[in-house]
C-alpha cells in the first residue's frame, strides 16, 4: 500500500534510509513498467497496424531508438538497425558550424556506434556542404553493414541513472549498457558467449556496484582481459577511437574497422587488430591526416582494403 509512504514521493524520508530507498525504487520501477506497457507497447502496436514505424527515445519497443549511448546499447541488444541520432544541432552560434569544425564530432559519434544521422531541416546548410554530406553517407554505408563487435555488457540498474556515464572500459574494448529487461532475457545456455535476442554476443558481463565494478575479482585493475582469453579488439595510440562491424558472408567473415584521429595533427600510427579469434593479430601501419579517418577492411581470405573516405570524395 503506497498511501502510508506518499511523503516519500515528495522526498521526505520515512522509517529508515534503506526503507526510503526501497520505496523510491519501487515507485520508479512501477512508473517505468507502466510507461513501457501502457504507452510505448500500445503506441507501437497501433503504429504497426497502420504500417508506420516508430522513432523516439531509447525504449526497446521502437523501430529506431533515438538517443546517444543508451540508444546504441539498446539497438545492439535488441537488434534494432540502424542506430540513429540527431547530430550537428545546437542553440548557440550564428551559422558558424563549418563542416571542418563538425567533422571531428561526427567521427566521434560514428566511432561510438551511431550509423544513421538525423539533421534538422532548417539548421544545416545542405547545399553548401555537399562534400561533408557525401562523407557521412559513405561512412554510414560501411557502418550499417553486419553487426557491431562489442565484448562487454555492463548491467546498469535503472535506479542509478546518473552512473551511466561513469563507466570506462579498458582501451581496445567496446561495451553496451544492459538494463534488467535485457539481463533477464540473456540466454547463458544457448552459447558459451552471452547471446541476446538480437544475436549480439558479449564475452564479459560487468555488474556495477555503488563504488566499484565487479569482474571476477574486485576491483579489476588489469589493463585488459587477456588473462581470460579475450585480447583487445584493437590496439591504437592515445587520442584515437574506432568502430568495428562484423559481416558474415557466404565466402566467410569480413571485419570492417573505422579508425579516427582525434588530434589536430598528422600522425603515423601502427594499429593491431584482433580478427577471427582473439589470438590472431593483424598489424597495419597507417598515415592519418589531422582529424582524419580511415576504414580498414579485413577478410578471412587474407584480403585487406584501406579506404580513406575523405580522399575518395576529393574532386
What is each model feature region?
Residues 1-315:
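Carbohydrate-binding surfaces of carbohydrate-active enzymes
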Amino acid at each position: 500500500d503506497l498511501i502510508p509512504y506518499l511523503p516519500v514521493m515528495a522526498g521526505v524520508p520515512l522509517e529508515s534510509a534503506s526503507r526510503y530507498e526501497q520505496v523510491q525504487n519501487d515507485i520508479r520501477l512501477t512508473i517505468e513498467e507502466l510507461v513501457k506497457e501502457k504507452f510505448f507497447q500500445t503506441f507501437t502496436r497501433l503504429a504497426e497496424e497502420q504500417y508506420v514505424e516508430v522513432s523516439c527515445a531509447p525504449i526497446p519497443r521502437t523501430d529506431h531508438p533515438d538517443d546517444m549511448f543508451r540508444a546504441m546499447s539498446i539497438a545492439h541488444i535488441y537488434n534494432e538497425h540502424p542506430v540513429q541520432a540527431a547530430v550537428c544541432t545546437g542553440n548557440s552560434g550564428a551559422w558558424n558550424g563549418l563542416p571542418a569544425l563538425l567533422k571531428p564530432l561526427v567521427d566521434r559519434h560514428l566511432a561510438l556506434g551511431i550509423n544513421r544521422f538525423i539533421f534538422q531541416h532548417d539548421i544545416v546548410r545542405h547545399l553548401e556542404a555537399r562534400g561533408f554530406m557525401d562523407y557521412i553517407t559513405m561512412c554510414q554505408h560501411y557502418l550499417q553493414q553486419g553487426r557491431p563487435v562489442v565484448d562487454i555488457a555492463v548491467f546498469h540498474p535503472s535506479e542509478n541513472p546518473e552512473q551511466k556515464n561513469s563507466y570506462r572500459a579498458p582501451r581496445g574494448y567496446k561495451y553496451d549498457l544492459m538494463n534488467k529487461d535485457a539481463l533477464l532475457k540473456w540466454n547463458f545456455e544457448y552459447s558459451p558467449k552471452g547471446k541476446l535476442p538480437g544475436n549480439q554476443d558479449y564475452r564479459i558481463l560487468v555488474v556495477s556496484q555503488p563504488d566499484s565494478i565487479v569482474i571476477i575479482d574486485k576491483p579489476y585493475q588489469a589493463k585488459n582481459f587477456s588473462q581470460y582469453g579475450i585480447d583487445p579488439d584493437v590496439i591504437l595510440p592515445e587520442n584515437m577511437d574506432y568502430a568495428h562491424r562484423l559481416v558474415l558472408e557466404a565466402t566467410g567473415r569480413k571485419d570492417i574497422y573505422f579508425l579516427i584521429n582525434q588530434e589536430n595533427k598528422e600522425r603515423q600510427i601502427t594499429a593491431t587488430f584482433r580478427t577471427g579469434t582473439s589470438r590472431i593479430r593483424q598489424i597495419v601501419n597507417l598515415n592519418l591526416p589531422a582529424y582524419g579517418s580511415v576504414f580498414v577492411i579485413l577478410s578471412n581470405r587474407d584480403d585487406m582494403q584501406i579506404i580513406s573516405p575523405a580522399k575518395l570524395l576529393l574532386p
